Amino acid sequence: MAQGLVTFADVAIDFSQEEWACLNSAQRDLYWDVMLENYSNLVSLDLESAYENKSLPTEKNIHEIRASKRNSDRRSKSLGRNWICEGMLERPQRSRGRYVNQMIINYVKRPATREGTPPRTHQRHHKENSFECKDCGKAFSRGYQLSQHQKIHTGEKPYECKECKKAFRWGNQLTQHQKIHTGEKPYECKDCGKAFRWGSSLVIHKRIHTGEKPYECKDCGKAFRRGDELTQHQRFHTGEKDYECKDCGKTFSRVYKLIQHKRIHSGEKPYECKDCGKAFICGSSLIQHKRIHTGEKPYECQECGKAFTRVNYLTQHQKIHTGEKPHECKECGKAFRWGSSLVKHERIHTGEKPYKCTECGKAFNCGYHLTQHERIHTGETPYKCKECGKAFIYGSSLVKHERIHTGVKPYGCTECGKSFSHGHQLTQHQKTHSGAKSYECKECGKACNHLNHLREHQRIHNS
């Protein structure tokens, strides 16, 4: 009655010490269920083997093994230390009866060397990376890794959430996702009390307190708390952009940027403001938008004390103090503090207006102007005065309006000292000193120093 040994390293799943310690009892039970299922599937592939064995386990025995293993964690607690089980999969012989191949697992109990030691399989005998994907050529050291990887090509997502119908490629992804609906956060930081859905998130979070940054870039020496941060950072050195949009061909160095970009094509805006209902493509845009309602301006200039809702606004503002204008137009030589201003300016020379209103067809040379224009059609007035409740389409209009309540007149004439609340008022006033009359009537040639004076004059011709 010889039995042939079959390695199951290609279907085994190993956890590190750190990962195993983070699993709760339910997750460990799930692990054993998955392992048993994998073993059963492997054995079922060898139904044609004809051996003899009078001591094959019945289906009842298999269920007893499964039930016994599920209680292993609870039994280990009563013993005061952890026990782990080692499994050896053997190819059973077929008896003269009507037995089919079943799984023989010889569980050998032994105490763990350290608290929370994960289960270990026996030594592997196959070559590393011997399982290759026929679609992309990527190789794996285990068969189950290849099986999981192939779901990327097939698009198969067999694990569906009953709450929201979202589907996943792997069962552990579904388990983690379901915590979003239950609100379960079993992993709590002992230092600050912050709780997490997943143990891996807690492990990474703890590095904030310890200052540990184990992932270091070999090119520049910069260190990171997470491995994926290092991977993303290294693409700055290599220029690698692995993630390509199938709709327009644009490539990205980070997958989350591709996900956000795809929403431009799909029109999806999953992040909605509860105050005004406005929706956004990405969460960071919603956070920034909320500051309009709260008035929060966390980024303050150390030179003048002016505060901003976004850090890039502060960076741009600081160039006012330094006088820096590094972006110069090649057509006319005009220089700008910000690259975006140069791009917009160049459209004056080219006549390009890429931003078109779908309601009326009017086109603009920058997206911001289109966004503001669209509010004329929607009636949206997101900028509200806290003093009187008056609302405005544009933020600049609110700033100007607030000066009525504060009495601030920041625009002073250097000739006579007279101050104004708006810049255009000062510009018009200065013409009284210079004698400039820039508004000329096309009918009679008369010139005026104010646009409203020209309009009043033109009524003479119209009447």
From Swiss-Prot:
Q: Which SMART domains match?
A: KRAB, ZnF_C2H2
Query: Which Gene3D superfamilies does the record associate with it?
Result: 6.10.140.140, Classic Zinc Finger (3.30.160.60)
Q: What is its main location?
A: nucleus
Per the record, its GO cellular-component terms are:
nucleus
State where the record puts the cross-link Glycyl lysine isopeptide (Lys-Gly) (interchain with G-Cter in SUMO2): 109, 400
GO biological process annotation, one example = regulation of DNA-templated transcription
Question: What does the record give under GO molecular function?
Answer: DNA binding; zinc ion binding
Describe the location of the KRAB domain by residue ranges. 6-78
Please verify whether the record's keywords include ATP-binding. Answer: no
PROSITE patterns documented for this protein: KRAB, ZINC_FINGER_C2H2_1, ZINC_FINGER_C2H2_2
What InterPro entries does UniProt report for this protein, alphabetically? Answer: KRAB, KRAB_dom_sf, Znf_C2H2-type, Znf_C2H2_sf, Znf_C2H2_type
Region forming the signal peptide: none
Per UniProt, the C2H2-type Zn-finger stretches lie at 131-153, 159-181, 187-209, 215-237, 243-265, 271-293, 299-321, 327-349, 355-377, 383-405, 411-433, 439-461
Q: Does the keyword Ubl conjugation apply?
A: yes
Keywords from the named record: DNA-binding, Isopeptide bond, Metal-binding, Nucleus, Repeat, Transcription, Transcription regulation, Ubl conjugation, Zinc, Zinc-finger
- Where found? Nucleus
Alphabetized PANTHER family for the sequence: RIKEN CDNA 6720489N17 GENE-RELATED, ZNF44 PROTEIN
Describe the function of this protein. Answer: May be involved in transcriptional regulation. May play a role in spermatogenesis.
Family per record = Belongs to the krueppel C2H2-type zinc-finger protein family.
Name the UniProt record assigns to this protein: Zinc finger protein 331
Species name for this entry? Answer: Pongo abelii (Sumatran orangutan)
